[in-house]
């Protein structure tokens, strides 16, 4: 991944990506993209079929870059299968994880409103299937089916809230608190077992929380020693004292 830093000159556009990965097209179902993504799954069957006709699909191997900072941004990318990490690189080469996309999530939404270039990197975290809809096609659908616009605005609102929360924590909270709040937010509501699975590696979690993997490991051990959590196999963590965790 470090070799990415010096590859700013390659400007991949909508058509470049689809041609580069042409061999993977046949294995990706357009229907699986359209029906799984929240901004489309409320549409009627005929409306979905209309969108599928202009959707292009491709596959990416683990570690492969979908787009780079500086690339032309001219389409919406929808994750059909797998995971994508969106991150930025500082001038010194330090990585900052922005978000992780799961099936049904999308990126490239700014291209819907204006011509622009990518401001971050998108990399496949596992073998990943992606569907793409060009800006021109999607703008037509936004006019034709206004409910899509409302769904996109809702997602914008969620991302803005998350971004503001993350920025505030970076400025005001110590690493212990950032980590504790992250673990608490991973909890699903309900009365079931208080167990979570970390949605990313410790390296990515460190990047997301603005620290180092070593610090994450040390802070998790501290939280365990203090009786707030119990680390299990893999990425599983049991929350033993949620109220106490929220006060860290």
Predicted regions and their residues:
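Cyclic nucleotide-binding regulatory domains
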Residues: 38-39, 64-126
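Short loop/turn motifs at secondary-structure junctions and domain boundaries
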Residues: 49-50, 66-70, 190
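Polybasic "coupling" helices that flank or enter modular domains
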Residues: 125, 143-213
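Phosphate-/nucleic-acid-contacting segments
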Residues: 186-248
């Amino acid at each position: 991944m470090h070799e990415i830093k010096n590859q700013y000159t390659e400007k991949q556009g909508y058509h470049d990506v689809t041609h580069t990965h042409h061999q993977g097209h046949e294995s990706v179902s357009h229907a699986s993209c359209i029906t799984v993504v929240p901004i489309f799954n409320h549409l009627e069957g005929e409306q979905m079929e209309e969108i599928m006709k202009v959707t292009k699909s491709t596959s990416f191997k683990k570690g492969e870059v979908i787009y780079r900072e500086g690339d032309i941004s001219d389409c919406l990318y929808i994750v059909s299968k797998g995971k994508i990490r969106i991150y930025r690189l500082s001038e010194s080469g330090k990585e900052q994880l922005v978000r992780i996309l799961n099936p049904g999530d999308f990126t490239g939404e700014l291209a819907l409103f204006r011509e622009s270039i990518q401001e971050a990197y998108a990399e496949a975290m596992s073998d990943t299937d992606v569907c793409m809809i060009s800006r021109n096609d999607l703008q037509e659908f936004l006019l034709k089916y206004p409910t899509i616009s409302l769904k996109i605005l809702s997602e914008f609102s969620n991302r803005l809230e998350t971004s503001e929360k993350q920025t505030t924590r970076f400025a005001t909270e110590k690493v212990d608190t950032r980590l504790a709040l992250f673990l608490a937010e991973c909890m699903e509501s309900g009365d079931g077992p208080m167990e979570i699975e970390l949605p990313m590696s410790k390296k990515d979690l460190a990047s997301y929380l603005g620290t180092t993997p070593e610090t994450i490991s040390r802070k998790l051990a501290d939280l365990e020693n203090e009786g707030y959590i119990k680390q299990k196999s893999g990425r599983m963590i049991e929350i033993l004292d949620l109220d106490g965790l929220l006060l860290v």
